[in-house]
Amino acid sequence: MNNPSDQEPTASFETALCRLEEILEKMNSGTVSLDESLKLYEEADQLIIICNKRLNDAERKIEILVKNRSGELTLGNDDKPIIQDFKIASTS
């Protein structure tokens, strides 16, 4: 999973986010060389793109689910589609 271009087509949001956390820990450890830090930074940049794509896709799906009975999106006062927040239950 070290090459983000290999992950891009199939990487889930959670997988990409987990790898981003690993990279952050490694870079914050102070034990990596400058060259390795640059490679990790490049990988993190690609993973952020993957995460953004997955989040944008999810937002579009939510907008579809929030359509009113006539098939139109329910719009707020700002003329933007109303989307609903999902609350994730705590696992602790």
From Swiss-Prot:
Pfam families: Exonuc_VII_S
Molecular function, one GO term: exodeoxyribonuclease VII activity
One GO CC annotation: cytosol
EC number: 3.1.11.6
Annotated InterPro entries: Exonuc_VII_S, Exonuc_VII_ssu_sf
Catalytically driven reaction(s): Exonucleolytic cleavage in either 5'- to 3'- or 3'- to 5'-direction to yield nucleoside 5'-phosphates
Keyword Cytoplasm found: yes
GO biological process: DNA catabolic process
NAD recorded as keyword: no
Highest taxon listed in the record's lineage: Bacteria
UniProt keywords, alphabetically: Cytoplasm, Exonuclease, Hydrolase, Nuclease
Intracellular or extracellular location(s): Cytoplasm
NCBIfam families: PRK00977.1-4 (NF002140), xseB (TIGR01280)
HAMAP family in UniProt: Exonuc_7_S
Function: Bidirectionally degrades single-stranded DNA into large acid-insoluble oligonucleotides, which are then degraded further into small acid-soluble oligonucleotides.
Family indicated by similarity: Belongs to the XseB family.
Subunit structure: Heterooligomer composed of large and small subunits.
Name of this protein: Exodeoxyribonuclease 7 small subunit
